[in-house]
């Protein structure tokens, strides 16, 4: 579950960087 949450955070960070 933690990995899933982390993946979600990474997805948002990537979108913010883009």
Curated annotation (Swiss-Prot):
Top-level taxonomic group: Bacteria
Gene Ontology cellular component terms for the protein in this record: ribonucleoprotein complex; ribosome
Descriptive protein name: Small ribosomal subunit protein bS21
Family to which this protein belongs: Belongs to the bacterial ribosomal protein bS21 family.
Lineage: Bacteria, Pseudomonadati, Pseudomonadota, Alphaproteobacteria, Caulobacterales
Protein encoded by which gene: rpsU
Keywords: Ribonucleoprotein, Ribosomal protein
Organism: Brevundimonas vesicularis
């Amino acid at each position: 579950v933690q990995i899933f949450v982390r993946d979600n955070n990474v997805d948002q960070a990537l979108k913010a960087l883009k």
